Swiss-Prot record:
Protein name per UniProt: Adenylyltransferase and sulfurtransferase MOCS3
UniProt subcellular location: Cytoplasm, Cytosol
SUPFAM superfamilies: Activating enzymes of the ubiquitin-like proteins
Gene3D superfamilies assigned: NAD(P)-binding Rossmann-like Domain, Rhodanese-like domain
UniProt keyword Signal present: no
The organism of origin for this protein: Bos taurus (Bovine)
High-level lineage: Eukaryota, Metazoa, Chordata, Craniata, Vertebrata
Length: 455
């Protein structure tokens, strides 16, 4: 009897806790909604100079206050400094975390994106419970928990040519934690026009870079990169991958440069580029070209006098999301639903998976033949032999004289289109139908098999 009463009591307590949790979630949603509305009206006045630190602040920052290079005056400068963080992802999270911990007076947080499960391995301010919420509000809440004295101003929006210059002018130092060329050019041009130093970092795979632009007569981003790279040569973290600890290292180094700049110590990497190779454990530093007198942004006769359409300038989108290529006509593609119907009908065909081996190791469809895109691009003899044998085997299962269509799949439907173009150019396959599967395996996971891993 006692055991039964305990079970009933526990069940009642669980029900009560679930009701409390539901209420808390509703309050959180309301608070986030209110925050999104109030974020449009942000403080524009500069922070007042600080004459002294409180007793609590002295205790809190005591370990850095005793540094002769920083001291009381440097800490007072940090308390009166406003830093704009563009991007609350793998770089922006550790950067903002250390800026808040060090006592920077105001942090502006710019990001249009929401928290996703794939962010959590490297974006350390966000947690599982906030999936689907705006990154800037998740980050601001975490930073306030860390240091309630720091003013966090979230901007849940993309940085655009219409808003960037006004926003940059409200801050003393800007940190670029973005992951795309249009935003880098936009932020750099805005910093030049506003007269603000720019601390810029990037990370991909096991490598990272860090520099400071437009400081003390040093070069701006356009001085170093007058023309944007071809869009097809740019690899994002979503495409190429990145190790979370790499973004952590670069974000911390970025925070160090921001703190030195804001405290009046001067940055270490103005006119220099720090290169980090995590696999080798190496740090290298190279000197950048000097400020160009003919630079379109910061030169003697600049032509960039206001902000422009940077997506058109770069030929790519101002986002780190995977771009959807359109290399094929609709007739050369098949939807994931139509492919599933074809598969269920047991119609003879060959499914060719062109992802790299490292992605195939994560997940695959068991009936797919794997030949990486790179092997097709270089016409690898062994891969061609395997493909030829698979086509011949497919013909044996088809009606006499019938051809076996090839359907090409990858993660998202981009590399598969490139592969179709390659296969269409081969004379020995000109009699075969070759099509790309729209949306790739992520479409399969979303629309066909909810248990299929997404990565």
């Amino acid at each position: 009897m006692a055991a039964r009463e305990e079970v009933l009591a526990l069940q009642a307590e669980v029900a009560q806790r679930e009701e409390e949790l539901s209420s808390l979630k509703q309050r959180l949603a309301a608070a986030l909604s209110t925050g999104q509305e109030s974020a449009r009206s942000v403080p524009v006045s500069p922070l007042p100079p600080r004459a002294a630190l409180s007793r609590e602040e002295i205790r809190r920052y005591s370990r850095q206050l005793v540094l002769p290079e920083l001291g009381m005056q440097g800490q007072l400068r940090l308390a009166a400094a406003a830093v704009l963080v563009v991007g609350c992802g793998g770089l922006g999270c550790p950067l903002a975390q250390y800026l808040a911990a060090a006592g920077v007076g105001r942090l502006g947080l710019v990001d249009y994106d929401v928290v996703e499960a794939s962010n959590l391995a490297r974006q350390v301010l966000h947690g599982e419970a906030l999936a689907g919420q705006a990154k800037v509000f998740s980050a601001a809440a975490a930073l306030r928990r860390l240091n309630s004295a720091v003013e966090c101003v979230p901007y849940a929006q993309a940085l655009t040519p219409a808003t960037a210059l006004d926003l940059v002018r409200r801050y003393d130092v800007v940190a670029d934690c973005s992951d795309n060329a249009p935003t880098r050019y936009l932020v750099s041009d805005a910093c030049v026009l506003a007269g603000r130093p720019l601390v810029s970092a990037s990370a991909l795979r096991f490598e990272g870079q860090l520099t400071v632009y437009h400081y003390g007569g040093g070069p701006c981003y356009r001085c170093v990169f007058p023309r944007p790279p071809p869009a097809e040569t740019v690899t994002s973290c979503a495409d190429g991958g990145v190790l979370g600890a790499v973004t952590g290292v670069l974000g911390c180094l970025q925070a160090l440069e921001v703190l030195k700049t804001a405290a009046g110590l001067g940055p270490s990497y103005s006119g220099r580029l720090l290169l980090f190779d995590a696999l080798r454990g190496d740090f290298r530093c190279i000197r950048l070209r000097r400020r160009r007198p003919d630079c379109a942004a910061c030169g003697e006769r600049p032509t960039v006098t206001d902000l422009q359409d940077y997506e058109s300038f770069c030929g790519s989108s101002a986002t780190d999301k995977c771009r959807s290529l359109r290399l094929l006509s609709p007739e050369e593609r098949i939807s994931i639903m139509d492919y599933k119907r074809l598969l269920d009908s047991r119609s003879p065909h060959l499914l060719l998976d062109v992802r790299p081996q490292v992605e195939v190791d994560i997940c695959r469809l068991p009936h797919a033949l794997h030949i990486p895109l790179k092997s097709l691009e270089r016409r690898d003899a062994e891969s061609l032999k395997v493909l030829g044998e698979a086509i011949r085997e497919g013909k044996q299962g088809a009606q006499e004289g019938a051809s076996v269509p090839i359907y090409v799949i990858c993660k998202l439907g981009n590399d598969s289109q490139k592969a179709v173009k390659i296969l269409q150019s081969w004379a020995d396959l000109d009699s075969l139908t070759v099509k790309d599967v729209v949306g790739g395996l992520m479409a399969w996971a979303a629309k066909i098999d909810g248990t299929f891993p997404q990565y």
